[in-house]
Amino acid sequence: GNSESASIMSIEASREYRFDEAHQQYHIADEELRTAHTIQTQLLQAAARGESMEMDILMVHAQDHLTMASLLKEVSKEFMNIYQEIQALKGEKR
């Protein structure tokens, strides 16, 4: 959830041409996502070693959140780029 929230905050800041804040939130999203990805990798490695692991709805839900957070982080970067181009085309400085 933290990565998703930071990505949304990055998009909101970009919309208002606050790109320093947008970049900061993007990097927070990236750090949070890296932490989650590390945990996911540890679980996958344990499964690959043959360690028994219960797959329940909570694990599926966690994987769904990780996937969505990853996608949203990339989308927030695209919004940042788009809003920077819009600002440049308008010739606005904020």
Stretches found by the model and what they are:
Residues 1-94:
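Terminal alpha-helical segments
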